[in-house]
From Swiss-Prot:
This is Small ribosomal subunit protein uS15. The gene is rpsO. Transmembrane segments: none annotated. The keyword Ribonucleoprotein applies. NCBIfam families: S15_bact. It comes from Psychrobacter sp. (strain PRwf-1). SMART domains: Ribosomal_S15 (SM01387). InterPro entries: Ribosomal_uS15 (IPR000589), Ribosomal_uS15_bac-type (IPR005290), uS15_NS1_RNA-bd_sf (IPR009068). Pfam families: Ribosomal_S15. One of its GO terms (molecular function) is structural constituent of ribosome. Part of the 30S ribosomal subunit. Forms a bridge to the 50S subunit in the 70S ribosome, contacting the 23S rRNA.
Length: 88
């Protein structure tokens, strides 16, 4: 689970302006951090299917936001996926 300080660090790293918490970059980065955290959780708790449903929902939401960002601004999309290490 992400702590409040972890969330603030992610927001500070990806925000476009001070106080920005809703830009696609910030939302995608927060979802990616939560997804990575849950993936580590599933290595230990393989039978936790209830949380797995939430993980799939987060992955789908991130995919939608990435598609939106790609459609709106391709350069921001490309820089974000390289920073996050998505799409090798």
């Amino acid at each position: 689970m992400l702590t409040n300080t972890d969330r603030q660090q992610v927001i500070a790293q990806y925000q476009r302006a001070p106080g920005d918490t809703g830009s696609p970059e910030v939302q995608i980065a927060l979802l990616s951090a939560r997804i990575n955290d849950l993936q580590a959780h599933f290595k230990e708790h393989k039978g936790d299917h209830h949380s797995r449903r939430g993980l799939i929902r987060m992955v789908n939401q991130r995919r939608k936001l990435l598609d939106y960002l790609k459609r709106k601004d391709l350069t921001r999309y490309a820089s974000l996926i390289s920073e996050l290490g998505l799409r090798r």
